């Protein structure tokens, strides 16, 4: 069994990404990034409150194959494919309002990676 460390795209097809989108975008190309950056202190304050809430707010990322050690990538979801996670959005009203102001936003979350852990190279359908 060989290991595939290349860029992969889908839950079902772990082959190389075949799309035409860039791997990274320049934030300066999007007007809404300035609004998020200008409000980073509010976002950070709400994140700190969630983290102080303990492990019940952090969930292991659902796709264990994307990390070198399971349970090391943790997430707090706000939106996933347009579905709003009210549990977290209600605790972070400023962050939620900022996210909802992003045109075309489908998915958003806070993410944390344990020290000495690795997220494998990938390109998903929302980045």
Language model region names:
Residues 1-123:
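Fe(II)/2-oxoglutarate oxygenase catalytic core
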